[in-house]
UniProtKB/Swiss-Prot annotation:
Protein name per its UniProtKB record: Co-chaperonin GroES
InterPro entries in the record: Chaperonin_GroES, Chaperonin_GroES_sf, Chaprnonin_Cpn10_CS, GroES-like_sf
Role this protein plays: Together with the chaperonin GroEL, plays an essential role in assisting protein folding. The GroEL-GroES system forms a nano-cage that allows encapsulation of the non-native substrate proteins and provides a physical environment optimized to promote and accelerate protein folding. GroES binds to the apical surface of the GroEL ring, thereby capping the opening of the GroEL channel.
Organism listed in the record: Streptococcus pneumoniae (strain Taiwan19F-14)
Listed Gene3D superfamilies: GroES chaperonin (2.30.33.40)
Tagged with keyword Cytoplasm: yes
Family, as annotated: Belongs to the GroES chaperonin family.
Amino acid sequence: MLKPLGDRVVLKVEEKEQTVGGFVLAGSAQEKTKTAQVVATGQGVRTLNGDLVAPSVKTGDRVLVEAHAGLDVKDGDEKYIIVGEANILAIIEE
């Protein structure tokens, strides 16, 4: 399993029509974003005074992420993307 560092997040992209709260996203929104599930998170980032700021997302969250963000990676037969937390636009609450 991949363990991201810092503020990076490992995502499993959902390969289906995107909906948010039961609403289908418009075609233009689907081209700019994708829906994914958080598989793993880094420990967070440190502030200048050394405090650790934990990620805003957690394993299992469904998120909306910028379509072209991140790096495509494979772990065995599974495909994932690794993004910085700043590339995650929203947590999808059901």
